[in-house]
Amino acid sequence: QRSLVGSEMCIRDRIQIVQLHGTDKKLYELVAPLVMSPEVLKQNYNYPFRTSEEYEWFVALDNKHVVGFVPVEHKKYECVINNYYIKERNVDTLKLLLEKVLEKQGEESSLTAVSFVEDRDVFSELGFLEDKVWTRYVKMKKNR
């Protein structure tokens, strides 16, 4: 196991990851201000965020403020990460969220992620393999 660098240790001490069901009232309270924010939507290329019974959300909190979230959709044969948000594109926050997703995922099924091109290295570092590359996104898979 590799040692943590200073910034990573600091963020791990500060950030709390909460897991919430896709229709949990607390989820709406936490993410509603962000998913309707023009700045956040712009970072997501104006693509809306969505949720349903089939989603599990991993939300990163720094002093009770949301600094990122990764929704995971549970489909019949796979789970899918699509349309996530990381404040200021902080790599350490993204990594922390993805590690929690992988920890909870277990051996359940394969995991597909549609990541931003800028984040492909973080996903690769955690064992995701590139499947398709588009202009803004990379479809990546992590098999169990």
Residue ranges and their predicted role:
Residues 59, 64-73, 80:
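Conserved beta-strand in the GNAT
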Residues 12-44:
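Short amphipathic alpha-helix that is part of the acyltransferase structural core
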Residues 1-11:
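Single conserved hydrophobic/aromatic residue that forms the stacking wall/gate
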Residues 89-104:
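Conserved acetyl-CoA-binding loop-helix of GNAT-fold acetyltransferases
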Residues 73-89:
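Conserved acetyl-CoA binding element of GNAT-fold acetyltransferases
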Residues 37-57, 61:
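Active-site rim helix/loop that mediates acceptor-substrate recognition in acyltransferases
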Residues 105-117:
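Conserved GNAT acetyl-CoA-binding A-motif
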Residues 116-135:
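Conserved active-site alpha-helix within GNAT-family acetyltransferase domains
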